[in-house]
């Protein structure tokens, strides 16, 4: 993965903000090999999408807007990219591993519900993710004017 750079037009500064992967395939490979964690997945999603807190159902769990936003982001991202259930679960990284290690547990209910019901159990009450508009324009060099 590479570091993402974000340019601030107001200050002219460039900030290193997030880990960014070249593609969804690269993100999946990094997560599945243990080189990326859940925070890396969320950072990748946040780098490419505007997030709107959205109510969603996942199996028997109702998630009000603003609660379980990480699960909302991951499931919406996976749905947008038509990922299969196993690839979707892998995006939960260490949290999915914790669920797999303790199948009878009560934690991480969104992961457990998705394991049980798959895409048939997921329903969003809106559109949680919207692709960010990327501006690639460089600042004008004042000396050349």
Identify the meaning behind each predicted range.
Residues 55-63:
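A ubiquitous short alpha-helical element
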Residues 60-61, 68-109:
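Amphipathic protein-protein interaction modules
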Residues 14-16, 145:
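Short hydrophobic transmembrane-like helices used for membrane targeting/insertion
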Residues 33-53:
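Short, charge-rich, low-complexity alpha-helical interaction segments
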Residues 106-137:
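Long, compositionally biased
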Residues 25-27:
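Long, charge-rich, low-complexity intrinsically disordered regions
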């Amino acid at each position: 993965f590479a570091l993402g750079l974000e340019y601030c037009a107001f200050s002219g500064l460039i900030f290193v903000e997030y880990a960014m992967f070249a593609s969804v395939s690269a993100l999946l490979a990094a997560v599945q090999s243990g080189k990326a964690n859940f925070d890396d997945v969320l950072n990748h999603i946040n780098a490419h999408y505007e997030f709107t807190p959205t109510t969603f159902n996942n199996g028997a769990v109702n998630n009000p807007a603003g609660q379980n936003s990480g699960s909302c982001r991951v499931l919406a991202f996976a749905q947008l990219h038509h990922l299969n259930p196993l690839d979707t679960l892998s995006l939960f990284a260490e949290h999915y591993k914790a669920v797999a290690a303790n199948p009878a547990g009560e934690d991480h209910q969104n992961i457990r519900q998705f394991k049980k019901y798959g895409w048939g159990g997921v329903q969003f009450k809106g559109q949680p993710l919207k692709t960010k508009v990327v501006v690639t324009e460089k600042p004008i060099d004042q000396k050349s004017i």
